[in-house]
């Protein structure tokens, strides 16, 4: 037997995808990752998604080791099959000869440059560990994957030619965003699927910019990453301390949204979910754990989020969102985030937010892709502008049939968290009247402009929907 019964149940959403299958999941479980990170907090989302995905051996090195025991406990509680420990002098040598090992360097420009150049000194074209470089600085960052030593050495040289501070500005949600992208790149390396991100992916979550940089442009984008002129995070933090965000769904999408918002210190998170934790949730729903299987998702999420940020207020709504309770639940929140897994409740939530004049941040995920948009009532499109008619039940792939790569919801949830912060602080450029499409296999982000539908039955010129409606439940989009 390739996997035991518990592993089959845990990784079912991976196994049913032919690109992974049972053999691929076994390969993931046998793989090893070396993580070099400035702080434990920087590495938190990355480690959780690696553990959830089943990476068998995780070795960590932190400049600041405070609270690493708590992180290791959370990772093991999420998935008891993995091993996680600090890197010692023997660690790289124990795994460097394995074809299923890679290295991640995550942190500020100065830190990444230091670690890369240390590796260049000790390695060569015959002894090289495939490496993922993840640079973060406030809203900006840069990601690149190297499977050839010469390309890695050239990038390290480019970084060494610039003078970066050892520790730059706080990473905001770029920590979560980069961590999930790194986890995806690890799986692609291990399984040899998709296209590795061999050109630098530069991103700016404040303005929703995603650019693939050629080698000759790398220095330019490193300099852009280093800049922090357009936003002072200390001012933004002051504006979100009292922010109240409602997350509808504490699953695949709700997990990364809640984690990212907790890490940046928002005031209140409300969680709506009536379900309980199951083992099949744990390849992607990082708020939960093996020890909390059977517990309500909202309570399980509260336990984890309080361990991350004891000061945050968590309001639990252990209920199914319905026509009767939607307005009452939404009423006391500033922003609503859609982490749902079905069309009927999405339409209900969209309508309720429109009538209550609440911004709604939407996302959906399936297999290796995701999309997101931001809906501001009476200022742009609504969900019904995109899909005037609800899809018939069974017309799309069901949850059980489609599968999903565990870290993909993490990418989209991080985007949703960034949108919530920008709306609350009144900064940057949101996804209003735009859709962001993400293809994990190619690490591509595509922005599509939208127009408000003047014939929309809810927000158009002649609306015909004037009250909330109840629909039959179905499950066609995975979260």
Model-derived features: where do they sit?
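Adenine nucleotide-associated cytosolic modules
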Residues: 1-479
